């Protein structure tokens, strides 16, 4: 029997890699020009890292982690995303008191159902600003996103932003949402009923049509925000509206539990159902969750497979190939 590659883990051949090389070089040039430095973290981490960062209620931890016991019966996992590993590395090196602008790139792993734009081994590049409080850093990262799209020739895209407020804001909204949805439990998908118990905010991210129909008349997260984050969102939209298509989306919560403050997502209709190719936000409490002293943080990650599909840049055609022939004198 022929040995095949694992499902959702495709090979990349030379003809595929021409675009990949253009993308990787463009990413590193833009990241470096914006003052970030590269960091590399292991593919394998303690499973506890992702339980405490991504969140026990998330689909990633519950269904998608590639985890196994090593020979010392320690549970370890292939990384499903990059931010948690970067924060762990900074805590481990005792550098939380310093400011960092870092970027990374490499393979990630999630046990998902393979489909267009979604693989079990996929590649991400990301940027993390550590030690930078809310304000200018949000503007810098969105500017970087716009610059990346310009350099890659991606013209048709939209930036969606939202603000997740503070702990009290989330708690008040989640209580109101539960009160609204509890009389309708029989119409909710079982996955969304479970979300309602573990983390009601995640229901906003539901893909179930029946749930989305209910949410159309549910309490809006924006109505629970104080004036300060609302003004912050308005100012960001006004600042960038001449440069790109950008708007507030009050249903945007992102798929990872560690986000606080601003969250954003970049989508393109050209990608179909899996339309997001970049996402990020602020996660000021993550370092404490991982045993650190606390550190402001904001970042984003790009799905490279999805951005490859959008790139308007074509690999150079008819490149001259040079052959070197060694000529020597014969004795």
Where are these regions (language model features)?
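Auxiliary tRNA-acceptor-end handling modules of aminoacyl-tRNA synthetases
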Residues: 1-17
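Positively charged, Gly/Ser-enriched RNA/tRNA-binding surfaces
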Residues: 16-36, 45-46, 63, 81-96, ...
């Amino acid at each position: 029997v022929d040995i095949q590659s694992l499902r959702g883990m495709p090979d990349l051949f030379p003809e595929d890699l021409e675009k990949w090389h253009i993308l990787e070089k463009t990413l590193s040039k833009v990241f470096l020009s914006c003052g970030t430095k590269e960091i590399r973290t292991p593919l394998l981490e303690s499973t506890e890292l992702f339980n405490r960062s991504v969140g026990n209620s998330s689909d990633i931890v519950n269904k998608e982690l590639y985890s196994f016991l090593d020979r010392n019966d320690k549970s370890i996992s292939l990384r499903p995303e990059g931010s948690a590993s970067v924060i762990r590395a900074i805590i481990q090196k005792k550098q939380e008191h310093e400011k960092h602008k870092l970027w990374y790139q490499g393979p990630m792993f999630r046990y998902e159902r393979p489909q267009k734009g979604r693989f079990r081994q996929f590649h991400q590049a990301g940027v993390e600003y550590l030690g930078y409080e809310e304000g200018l850093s949000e503007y810098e990262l969105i500017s970087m996103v716009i610059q990346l799209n310009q350099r890659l020739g991606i013209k048709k895209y939209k930036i969606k932003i939202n603000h997740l407020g503070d702990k009290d804001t989330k708690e008040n909204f989640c209580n109101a949402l539960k009160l609204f949805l509890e009389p309708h439990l029989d119409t909710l998908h079982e996955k969304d009923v479970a979300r309602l118990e573990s983390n009601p905010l995640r229901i906003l991210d539901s893909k179930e049509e029946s749930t989305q129909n209910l949410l159309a008349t549910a309490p809006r997260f924006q109505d629970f925000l104080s004036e300060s984050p609302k003004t912050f969102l308005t100012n960001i939209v006004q600042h960038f509206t001449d440069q790109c298509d950008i708007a507030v989306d009050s249903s945007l919560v992102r798929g990872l539990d560690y986000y606080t403050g601003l969250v954003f997502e970049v989508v393109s209709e050209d990608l179909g159902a899996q339309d997001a190719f970049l996402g990020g936000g602020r996660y000021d409490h993550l370092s404490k969750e991982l045993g650190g002293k606390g550190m402001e943080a904001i970042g984003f990650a790009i799905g490279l497979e999805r951005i490859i599909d959008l790139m308007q840049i074509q690999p150079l055609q008819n490149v001259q190939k040079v052959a070197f022939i060694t000529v020597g004198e014969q004795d």
